[in-house]
Structure formats: C-alpha cells, structure tokens
C-alpha cells in the first residue's frame, strides 16, 4: 500500500512542485502585509497629532468631497477604535478606492493602494502573474494552474501522511526530529518529513479553503458540506449596482444643489448672524446623520474594533477570535438617522458567515497573532517541501545510476 502512495506522492509532486513553492512562498509574504505597510507608511495610516475631538463627520466628509472630481463621490467611512489612526474614506470609483484622512484637520493623507511588491506577490499567489483576458473570455490559465496545483497538493499531503505513518511509538518520536548534525542529506530528509508533518494541518486548511476561489464547482460542494447554498453573484451584483446608482444619484443631486446655492449663500453670508451654523453641511449634506450614527454605535459597543458607515447602513467589528470579517450590521433611515434594522452577527445566517470564516482560516488570522505566525511558518515550510523533495529525488536518481 505504501509503495502505491509513494508513487502517487512522487509523480504528483514532480511536475507541480515549483508552482506549489511559488504559491506557498508568496502566501507567506502576504500574511504580514498590513503590518509591513503600516511600518513603512505610518504617515499614511496614522495622524500626526491626536486632538481632543475630531471634526464633525459631515464637515469632514464634505471637506474631502471638495477635493474629488465631480465624477467621484464619498460612499463610506471606516473609523478605528484607535484615536491615532486616520479615517478611511471610501470612494465611488475606481473599484475599492479609498483615501486616508486626518479626522482632526481634514487633511487628505493619501490613497489606500497596494504597494507594487505586495501586488506582485498577490498576483503570483492567485494567478502566477497571469492576467484575465478582457471581457473575461477564454481560460484564465494562471488561475487554473494555481487551482489544479492546489488541488493536487491536497493529495500530495494526504499521501505523504500515509507514507510517514509510523508503526511504533519510538518510530513516531524519531520521525518528528530534525537533525542538523548528521550531514546535509539527513537534514533535508528530516526537514521534508518532520517539517511536512508539523505543517500538515495548516497546509491542508489553506489548500482546502483556497480552492473555493479557484473552482465554482468546488465552492458549491464546500458550501454544501456546511449546509450553505452559494449565493448567486449576478443577482447580488445587480442589487449592489442598483443601490450604488441610487446613492450616486442622491450624491450628485446634493452636489448640484450645493453648486446652485453657492451664489445665494455668498449673498446671504453678510446678513447671516455670526452664531447661525445652518450652512450647507447641516441640512443638505448626505452625511448629516453619520456622526449621530457613529456616536450611537460607539456608546452601544465600547469594545469595538472598527465602525463603518455608508448611506443607510453601518457595521461594527470587534477584536475577537474566529471569523475576522464578522460584524454586527445596522440599517438606518437617511432622512432622520433612526435605526430601522439590526442584525447581530450571532443571529446571522450561515451564508453570511462562511465566506468570512473561509478567508480567516486561509490567511490564519482566526486565532490572532499566534495563528498568523504559525500560518506564516507553515507556508514557508510548504514552499520548502517541494525543494527538499526535489533534492532527495535527484540524489536517489544519481545513486541508482551509479
């Protein structure tokens, strides 16, 4: 039986080993992307001086809006519990665009964008640097190759476990040692065998979750195992697009109204009492109730990690183990700021949780910094396994030929 599994292990590993190395290594680099970015770009992510209180939300966002082209609008804001961290302001376009803003001065600190190095690593990890054809036509070869390699990695890991399985307790103890004093060949052998066993659970978790991004059929089957039906992306996209169009129409109307009222305000400013604060921010601003919403949620959730607000919706996330994308969700009336619906995470359907769990397990942040470090080490071992395997295989071939 083990002889069959040895052949499976070898002949699945040889053609795809280098790809697995690239995918695992790039994945390891991405584990601490946020920390590295914040270390090198602290001026972008953090404010220079923490003051007693930030600017009112409507005034802050209106100030940001004046720096944007007419075709771009503010769609949301994310506020950290850390008073020294800059607000992240979401924009209508391009997709997922956002700015970091000093909430105490209104200064736009810069764009939120992936560095060239980490974008390179991400494209390597997901698509082997390939790009999808315009119009999504044809086969996305990079994505396909990564998916097939990841699927085969699952069988390689399982076959490796069968080959490794010791018969005695003494053999188990010896098979989990890595010896560095008996020559390079013994070291690479121990690293391949023992290192593979130490990383096995994490590598399997990363592979099984990662496949949900590669193959729709696998994603459907994976979801069904947990009793969840895959939501139709097309319907979701249409609904989101419709909501976005409504929001942009409302914001465009606000911009036009503000533009038309500029001359009137200029004429009235000289007659307005000095203590009258009823300017363009107080009534016409689409952000007029956002500060009130934030204050309510902050009082209700003193241990929050981040509060995000957009037109008619808000969410609160926490520093907890488990699904790192978990959040309590709220809907509110944009005309009076009253909450209309509350959806606490614990009461949400499985369909609203599983994607966050998949991501959290895949990147290893479900257990905080400890599991992230273990995931990083496991991914590096995953990158080393094919290389040590090639070394041992070539050594064996040379020995046989002699």
Label the predicted regions.
Residues 1-402:
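Conserved histidines in hydrophobic membrane contexts and catalytic metal-binding motifs
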